[in-house]
Amino acid sequence: MRRDMNLDETNDVTATTQDVLAHHLECFGKVDLAGTMADYTDASRFFTPDGLLRGSEAIRRFFAVLFEEFEKPGMSFELLRQEISGDTAYIVWTAETADNRFEVGTDTFIVQNGKILTQTFAGKISPKH
């Protein structure tokens, strides 16, 4: 059973979640694989439309492939919405790469101890070719 947190603890958790999300988005924008992976641990889980990724090595492989696409010239990314409450962050975004149009993407992050413990991703992706 989860204990009730006082307001200061809730604010601290929210601030940590905000910091982790800001770092994650900054590293994603720079296509920085090492920086992105600093947000995950071997206990992290990442739910994608293609299945569950468990641990930092599986998540690293996912981002390595994604970053190959996102580092090509002409990439654009727009963050449409960001909500943070306690240990949970939610974002909605659009992006375009040389290969695909991400008409909408959404991620949810659960942050514990300064790391992303759980992440979900879903999106509507249309190939350009």
List the model feature ranges, each with a label:
Residues 14-15, 53:
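Short, solvent-exposed loop/helix junctions and linker helices
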Residues 16-27:
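Solvent-exposed, amphipathic alpha-helical segments
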Residues 31, 50-51:
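Conserved short acidic donor-positioning loop in nucleotide-sugar-dependent glycosyltransferases
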Residues 51-54, 97:
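Glycine-/small-residue-rich active-site loops that bind phosphorylated ligands and cofactors
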Residues 30-43:
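Short, well-ordered alpha-helical segments enriched in acidic and aromatic residues
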Residues 2-12, 26-29, 47, 60-129:
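A beta-strand edge to alpha-helix "cap/lid" segment located at domain peripheries
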